[in-house]
């Protein structure tokens, strides 16, 4: 938990999921402060759009202006809602939209936290291009090290003239003025053929490894089990290639695709529809914080390629939460399979949670682990 006084109001903010007290990560950064410093409240006219507000620092500060919070992270939405409640601000003061929704017309102010991937930034800038006017004030912010020439060129190409500020507390801002530059249309998804299959994999802008199959998933796919039945889960599904493979290998199983990214879940749905339409009735698609709210003892198996980043921050909190949720939702003798970088040492984490862990396969970079939910542990 951390405190910030941004000139609009004094706030107490926390990350979601919360980090441990030994190595706490802040729920806000200097770029949030820097963005808010640029705004004179008297100049805010028209809708306020906030893009990629990680834990609600901007939304909480500008809540009295009824902002729209736009992004591709359900965790960020949950974190923002939690911080609104914690600071005594009505959740209804902020309207949440995912990045593929239609943005409000003629915004007065657009504040952008520059995302980690240029593909998501381009998708968002193209969406903004449809609604901003020459009067819209457009300001983006990030750590100075995360603003590159390619970032500025993208703003110039999609929206118009772009300048940067001096660095302040290692943060930098981008100011942009809309000028209707000519711009060719771009497809909503990036597609590629999946080797050794007849499948074409479609990827929305914010999907991990959208330009091709990542090496961890490739290794995982080589060791997926067959002859499973009942309900199984592709947890943190991304574009859904693991769940798609499980559907093909296990015709008696139903697969639940789960991710906190709406773009990931949409990509998974599209990939089942276009590659295994006959299996679509065996699928469920869920935007969720891991398996929050899912009933216990439901699944026969969970498959997971857990992230070790949250936006720009390195953290294993999300993976830790996924493992705990998986154990709660597995049936007795249900199995959790994960693939991970070897250096992350998830073996001991799983053994602590499940009381057991076995190595299924390993190479010079990745390891595949299996843990079984045993009846004696609660």
From Swiss-Prot:
Alphabetized SUPFAM superfamilies for the sequence: S-adenosyl-L-methionine-dependent methyltransferases
Intrachain disulfide bonds: none
Main localization category: cytoplasm
Any one Gene Ontology cellular component term annotated for this protein: cytoplasm
Pfam families with a match to the protein in the record: MTS (PF05175)
Entry EC no(s): 2.1.1.174
Reactions accelerated catalytically: guanosine(1835) in 23S rRNA + S-adenosyl-L-methionine = N(2)-methylguanosine(1835) in 23S rRNA + S-adenosyl-L-homocysteine + H(+)
Recorded superkingdom: Bacteria
Membrane-crossing residue ranges in chain numbering: none
Gene3D superfamilies associated with the record: Vaccinia Virus protein VP39
GO molecular function: 23S rRNA (guanine(1835)-N(2))-methyltransferase activity; nucleic acid binding
Keyword Protease: no
Keyword match Metal-binding: no
Swiss-Prot/TrEMBL keywords: Cytoplasm, Methyltransferase, rRNA processing, S-adenosyl-L-methionine, Transferase
Compartments where located: Cytoplasm
Membership in a protein family: Belongs to the methyltransferase superfamily. RlmG family.
Function: Specifically methylates the guanine in position 1835 (m2G1835) of 23S rRNA.
Protein name as catalogued: Ribosomal RNA large subunit methyltransferase G
The organism of origin for this protein: Salmonella paratyphi B (strain ATCC BAA-1250 / SPB7)
Lineage, broadest ranks: Bacteria, Pseudomonadati, Pseudomonadota, Gammaproteobacteria, Enterobacterales
Gene: rlmG
């Amino acid at each position: 938990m951390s405190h910030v006084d941004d000139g609009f109001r004094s706030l107490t903010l926390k990350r979601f999921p919360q980090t441990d007290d030994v190595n706490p990560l802040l729920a806000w950064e200097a770029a949030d402060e820097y963005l808010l410093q640029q705004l004179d409240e008297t100049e805010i006219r028209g809708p306020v759009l906030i893009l990629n507000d990680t834990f609600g620092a901007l939304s909480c500060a500008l809540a009295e202006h009824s902002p729209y919070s736009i992004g591709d992270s359900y965790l960020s939405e949950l974190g923002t809602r939690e911080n609104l409640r914690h600071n005594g601000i009505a959740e209804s003061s902020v309207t949440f939209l995912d990045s593929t929704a239609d943005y409000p017309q003629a915004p007065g102010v657009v504040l952008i936290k520059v995302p980690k991937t240029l593909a998501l930034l381009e998708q968002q800038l193209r969406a903004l291009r449809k609604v901003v006017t020459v009067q819209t004030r457009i300001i983006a912010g990030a750590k100075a090290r995360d603003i590159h020439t390619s970032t500025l060129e993208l703003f110039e190409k999609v929206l118009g003239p772009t300048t940067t500020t001096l660095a302040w507390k290692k943060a930098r801002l981008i100011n942009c003025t809309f000028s209707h530059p000519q711009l060719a249309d771009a497809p909503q998804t990036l597609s590629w053929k999946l080797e050794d299959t007849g499948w074409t994999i479609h990827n929305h802008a914010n999907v991990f490894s959208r330009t091709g199959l990542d090496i961890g998933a490739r290794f995982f796919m080589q060791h997926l089990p067959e002859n499973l039945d009942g309900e199984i889960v592709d947890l943190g599904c991304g574009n859904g290639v693991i769940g798609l493979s499980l559907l093909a290998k296990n015709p008696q199983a139903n697969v639940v695709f789960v991710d906190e990214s709406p773009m990931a879940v949409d990509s998974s749905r599209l990939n089942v529809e276009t590659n295994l339409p006959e299996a679509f009735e065996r699928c469920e698609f869920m935007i969720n914080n891991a398996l929050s709210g899912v009933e216990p003892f439901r699944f026969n198996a969970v498959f997971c390629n857990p992230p070790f980043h949250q936006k720009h921050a390195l953290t294993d909190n999300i993976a830790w939460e996924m493992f705990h949720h998986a154990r709660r939702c597995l049936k007795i003798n249900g199995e959790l399979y994960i693939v991970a970088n070897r250096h992350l040492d998830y073996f001991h984490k799983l053994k602590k949670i499940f009381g057991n862990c076995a190595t299924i396969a390993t190479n010079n970079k990745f390891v595949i682990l299996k843990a079984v939910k045993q009846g004696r542990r609660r």
